[in-house]
Amino acid sequence: MAKNTSITLGEHFDGFITSQIQSGRYGSASEVIRSALRLLENQETKLQSLRQLLIEGEQSGDADYDLDSFINELDSENIR
């Protein structure tokens, strides 16, 4: 259910919203704000996923890594 909410925007964002409506990309200020909120929600979801993956990576412990083996593997790939 839609809800009316009052917000205060500075001149910069007010002008940006107006330009988006005048360009024809959006039909109203509400459409611009909803689009912006969808982008923010998407960004926050991705950020939360990244944070969770970082935590899992840190908790998984140190990886077995041998620099010499890695260099040899790269060298053998270049020979092919």
From Swiss-Prot:
<protein>
    <recommendedName>
        <fullName>Antitoxin ParD</fullName>
    </recommendedName>
</protein>
<dbReference type="InterPro" id="IPR022789">
    <property type="entry name" value="ParD"/>
</dbReference>
<dbReference type="GO" id="GO:0097351">
    <property type="term" value="F:toxin sequestering activity"/>
</dbReference>
<comment type="function">
    <text>Antitoxin component of a type II toxin-antitoxin (TA) system. Neutralizes the effect of toxin ParE.</text>
</comment>
<keyword id="KW-1277">Toxin-antitoxin system</keyword>
<dbReference type="Pfam" id="PF03693">
    <property type="entry name" value="ParD_antitoxin"/>
</dbReference>
<dbReference type="GO" id="GO:0006355">
    <property type="term" value="P:regulation of DNA-templated transcription"/>
</dbReference>
<dbReference type="InterPro" id="IPR010985">
    <property type="entry name" value="Ribbon_hlx_hlx"/>
</dbReference>
<dbReference type="InterPro" id="IPR038296">
    <property type="entry name" value="ParD_sf"/>
</dbReference>
<comment type="similarity">
    <text>Belongs to the ParD antitoxin family.</text>
</comment>
<dbReference type="GO" id="GO:0098754">
    <property type="term" value="P:detoxification"/>
</dbReference>
